[in-house]
Amino acid sequence: MSGGFELQPQDGGPRVALAPGETVIGRGPLLGLHRNPCYYQSSEKSQLLPLKTNIWCWLNPGDHFSLLVDKYIFCVLSTHSEMEMECTLRNSQMLDEDDILNEIPKSSSADLPDKTPSAPRRERSTETAKPQAAANNMSFIGESRDLSKQQPNPSERKRILPAWMLTENSSDQNLSVISGGNNVTWESEKERVCKDKTQVNITQPGKKRLISSGSSESTSAKQDTGKKCKNDDQEESIISSKEMPQSFSAAMLHNTEIDNTKTNPQRSKVPVEALGKVSEHKIITKGSSNEDSTARSCSESYSSTQSKSFCDKPQKSHPEPSSNPPSPECVQAKATDSVPNGSEENKVQRTSCMYGANCYRKNPVHFQHFSHPGDSDYGGVNITCQDEADDRPECPYGASCYRKNPQHKIEYRHSTFPVRSISDEDDNVGQPNEYNLNDSFIDDEEEEYEPTDEDSDWEPEKEDLEKEDMEGLLKEAKKFMKRKK
């Protein structure tokens, strides 16, 4: 048999791969048992036929052979046929996917004209919203038709974006929209100049998100609500981490909400807030630091004018503020200047390290608690200083403590014990002694035993005897003098 074939045991078990070349049944892993003949069973016949020795027999995929009559039965399988089956299955699945992709844009283009007329029905309360909604509907239908024409071939298998994502991209390309209430125009970076209090030019890199009045926001809210609601939390966290004056965002959101509540109060809150947050995020991410400073100055002047206009509308009696609020950069600089002063006042004086310049420790915690040569507070507090108001316990060894651990010296006081003078040892001061001079026990304690190397037969000379007598007399005299005291 040639390579590319496997044997499947009918009794169960893993397949046996055949080596390329000729394979002899009854040798190697297919060794016969007790010299019994091997049996052959074709796919058409149902009986096992014994094979004759030294005679070739062709085995086709699907045939069976066994080493015993009822055991060790193997089925011949072709790996090439299995690969062809897998390829055919994959091709059929690819064709099914292509058919599904062809049906998707047709249904989307058919649904768009039915959904879009619902926007002008809900916005009949305002007359200005009707032409804008009709224009948006026409643009949606035109884009869907372009999509159906520009569909790629099934063989290319390119990803097709849904209609609401494409409409969002088209709305981003309108760069000259001007809102009626705020007079905010979006221009290129070269033309960014703060003109008047009520007119601000703000530049954004790349795509630019515009806030328009009336129904243009409410109509685009249908397609954009799903995506913007998901990204609301992420945008809030990004905006909060940036340094952007909050008055600008509050003024923009408040003004846009006033314009939108007239047309569609229930459905335009989410897109307006999302648009405001996206515009803030894009304003923050500017190219250079100079552009950041100019954009922030523009936003501050705009916020001051907006606050004036909003205060004048509901309450005309309020006077206008005399000066603009201070810039966040100035406030931040003041805060940073005041922080080091407070930190210097609250700084605790560290303890001087006992090793000084020879300290070998590298632990930063050690440097936080101990000062070293070169520090401003080095030498101010010593570990060995003993104050009267020191609450630490006294070390039992005092100044003669042998421990070298700095932590031990911090936790315990090591004061020197007062040395007793000769006058303190005098017994005349205080109460008199009540010793019994005739007590034999006291005399026995005071007598000292002096070991000698003298033998019992040794007799001392006269000079030695005189020295011993003198020493004994001196001891007795000292004892007598002590007793008198």
From Swiss-Prot:
Region listing for Disordered, in residue ranges: 103-156, 206-348, 420-470
Phosphoserine modifications at: S92, S125
Biased composition (Polar residues): 212-223, 237-249, 286-309
GO molecular function: 3'-5' exonuclease activity; ADP-D-ribose modification-dependent protein binding; DNA endonuclease activity; DNA-(apurinic or apyrimidinic site) endonuclease activity; histone binding; histone chaperone activity; nucleotide binding; poly-ADP-D-ribose binding
Compositional bias annotation for Basic and acidic residues: 310-319
Family label: Belongs to the APLF family.
The protein's name in its UniProt record: Aprataxin and PNK-like factor
Organism name: Bos taurus
Gene this protein is translated from: APLF
